[in-house]
Amino acid sequence: MSMFNKVVKEFQWGQHKVRLETGEVARQASGAVIVDVEDTVVLATVVGAKSAKPGQDFFPLTVDYLEKTYSAGKIPGGFFRREGRPSEHETLTSRLIDRPLRPLFPEGFYNEVQVVIHVLSVNPEIPADIPALIGASAALAVSGLPFNGPVGAARVAYIDNAYVLNPTRDQIKASSLDLVVAGTERAVLMVESEADQLSEDVMLGAVVFGHEQMQVAIDAIHELVREGGKPEWDWQPAPKNEPLIARVTELAQNDLLAAYQLRDKQARSTKLKEVYAATSAKLEEDASAAGTVAADKATVGNVLFDIEAKIVRSQILNGEPRIDGRDTRTVRPIEIRTGVLPRTHGSALFTRGETQALVVATLGTKGDEQIIDALEGEYRERFMLHYNMPPFATGETGRVGSPKRREIGHGRLAKRALVKCLPSADEFGYSIRVVSEITESNGSSSMASVCGGCLALMDAGVPMKAHVAGIAMGLILEGNKFAVLTDILGDEDHLGDMDFKVAGTEQGVTALQMDIKIQGITKEIMQVALAQAKEGRMHILGKMTSAVSGANTQLSEFAPRMITIKINPEKIRDVIGKGGSVIRALTEETGTTIDISDDGVVTIASTNSDGMAEAKKRIENITAEIEVGQVYEGTVLKLLDFGAIVNLLPGKDGLLHISEIVNERVKDINDYLKEGQQVKVKVIQTDEKGRVRLSAKALLNEAAAASQSDTPPQQ
């Protein structure tokens, strides 16, 4: 009899066979599931603490997605030859898994939960993110933790006007859509996508298609739980302290209402802090008078937050003005300025209300492309977008340093929005880096980065296919009443039921991200929300187009200029030289950057046009073929008894035989030639070994014949 209580479930999912397995590996974790999708194998584990830490007032969920290089049959690079800090892809996938799981834990559950997913084996054609999300959901489901799942997930492509479920990597490359959707049986919870200017209807259709197709995975997880699940935890939320809620409401309700009449964020924040402090102080007075212990600040803070949420939500649903005085459809005032920084290649300052992004575009060469060492193989990225939000953007102090998960996620969203509207590498050979510095933030800073990024790229002279704008939307739902909010503030983001960000052009959507916190948001509600988002996007695009009609036709004087020439691929080694000696000398002496691709395309870049011209000339000389009948100005390298070695082109010499110097007989070659002397010669013969024979007298004879033909006949 086996020591394992192993349970396996298999199902067909689109074009792939999926296997779920629990009970054999990682048995001391609260839950563990292995997912195998056509040889892409992940191990998802969950551990939940049995009790919350004292004073804990938030849900401490961490999700770590870790790729092991052995899964692709590789040994890690670097001195230590082991995996180091998570890559950007691992961080983004961790966020992707976290987002649909987090809202499914019950309110008041503050026990620490850690989800760890290891990628154990990789089929290069099957991305591991969807198996990882399915595995995390299944591990939580079998663990018995209080979790309102399971969650299913699916990737959807759009090829030849048809949706494709869980496409291979090759299919993703051919698709005009890469969309990931996750949700429960009844509701969509998360959408992440990149698209090539598709309509809202196509995008929503992909979400609905993915949600329908993921049901088979949810059913399989239910079966796995029935046979291999652990007993459900006997966890109950702490009973609500009704007397405390009543007293806090009595003390703070009117002051909170007054605070939310203040339209300025800083003034409102100051007033709210005062209300929180005054309420806590009054409760301590009450407790002191009664001889009891006052409720801790975290508990009081949670009650106050709930009151705030009710105030803001009811005002909006009742048609009253929003926190900053706007109605539900109005976009905040927009100010645009380009060419802000004098010595950068392109820059823009985009301000929308109290959110502001200073965005800078830099142009580089092929050598500046980012090399990504992924499990499926190494590849290069010519477009990079980095998002930074320092603490001063929200008027706070805090840590400044390497980017946090949120910054990496926002940067990727902005990149997704812009990448489909960039010119191809053939049209515009530069590598491009965009950096968005958030200088003020009150909601929707990632979408400000999209708008500012597009404007900075145009300022840098990048011929964008179209203007790209982004807008953040919110949604509040109570029973049958709902309100869609255009261009949400930070406070509205926290207090709403759904926030979603849509970026695109006049023609269609380039990126859509949705995070839904509740069940019950229907396709019809999403349709209304997307239509309102389009209205807001068109308004912003109008502002952007009136400020900047198109890309600058001239690059910045500080940007590198580039020329491209094609050489015979067999000559690449001649340009590079032994140990890189030739190309190193070329770049140092001409002040250029030179990149050579395997197909013989040479890109020369420099801010100095003379240096580029010199580098081009020298490369052409190095790679030129010696042709019979061609005349060259050469340098005598060495004198021999029977002739001279003459250098014609870099690395290409020929023999000028003693009999080919002049017409008369030459007794001593030193009477005619010296080492270092410039001499004009004609190529009279080459052989299959590359040997070249030269003649100087042939040119003398040609000159004599020409002068003779020019002499008029005598009478």
From Swiss-Prot:
Q: Where is the S1 motif domain?
A: 629-697
Q: What is its EC number?
A: 2.7.7.8
**Catalysed conversion reaction:** RNA(n+1) + phosphate = RNA(n) + a ribonucleoside 5'-diphosphate
Similarity comment: Belongs to the polyribonucleotide nucleotidyltransferase family.
User: Which segments constitute the KH domain?
Assistant: 560-619
Q: Which Gene3D superfamilies match?
A: GHMP Kinase, N-terminal domain (3.30.230.70), K Homology domain, type 1 (3.30.1370.10), Nucleic acid-binding proteins (2.40.50.140)
Q: What gene does the UniProt entry assign to this protein?
A: pnp
Q: What is this protein called?
A: Polyribonucleotide nucleotidyltransferase
- Subcellular localization, as worded in the UniProt entry: Cytoplasm
Q: Which coenzymes or cofactors are required?
A: Mg(2+)
Q: What does this protein do?
A: Involved in mRNA degradation. Catalyzes the phosphorolysis of single-stranded polyribonucleotides processively in the 3'- to 5'-direction.
Q: One GO MF term, please?
A: 3'-5'-RNA exonuclease activity
Q: Which GO terms describe its cellular component?
A: cytosol
Can you tell which superkingdom this protein's organism belongs to? Bacteria
* Sections of the chain in a coiled coil: none
A Pfam family: S1
What keywords appear on the UniProt entry? Cytoplasm, Magnesium, Metal-binding, Nucleotidyltransferase, RNA-binding, Transferase
